[in-house]
């Protein structure tokens, strides 16, 4: 299994694309996913979550996740990447917690979330305060409607998972096998 660390720290960025299989990866950005056509599978930690058209999901910073696409359908997804430091009121929670289930089914997605995603996807330039307000609205709905759990419970006892997670969190430090806690004793 190839794991990838992505450095996404550009404030707020959006991609509207046809999803493909994406290998396990993690990054410091909050990843918002909204299926506009078809279906995809979102893997978070060791769990796989099915998403249909109209479903919304969020992956918190530094959580290993991946995507799978099955079937021959036309699938389109909006991906938003939100830099967590833009949201100081949520920053601590974003580091500690993760949604128990990252997917909200279409019937439960609040219309404000859909409008905010579409607004953020459609702009190329705009007032940074408006951009931040729309992104903040998404996070407000996430934290008020999605049950949270400790982020450490999302992971796995898998050696590769733990190694990638450790490197991602400590890449600015001098890293050696002796310093990695899961290789000791």
In which residue ranges do the predicted regions lie?
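Basic/polar phosphate-binding segments, predominantly the helix-turn-helix DNA-binding elements
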Residues: 146, 169-170, 174-185
């Amino acid at each position: 299994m190839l794991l990838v660390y992505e450095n996404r720290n550009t404030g707020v960025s959006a991609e509207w694309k046809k999803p493909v299989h994406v290998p396990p990866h993690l990054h410091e950005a909050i990843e918002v996913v909204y299926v506009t056509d078809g279906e995809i599978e979102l893997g978070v930690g060791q769990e796989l979550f099915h998403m249909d058209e109209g479903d919304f999901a969020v992956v918190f910073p530094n959580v290993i996740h991946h995507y799978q696409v099955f079937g021959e359908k036309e699938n389109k997804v909006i991906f938003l990447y939100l830099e967590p430091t833009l949201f100081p009121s949520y920053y601590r929670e974003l580091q500690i917690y993760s949604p128990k289930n990252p997917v909200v089914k279409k019937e439960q997605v609040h219309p404000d979330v859909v409008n905010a995603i579409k607004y953020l996807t459609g702009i190329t330039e705009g007032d940074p305060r408006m951009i931040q307000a729309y992104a903040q609205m998404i996070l407000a709905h996430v934290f008020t409607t999605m049950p949270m759990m400790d982020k450490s419970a999302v992971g796995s006892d898998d050696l590769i998972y733990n190694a990638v997670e450790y490197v991602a969190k400590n890449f600015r430090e001098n890293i050696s096998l002796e310093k990695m806690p899961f290789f000791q004793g």
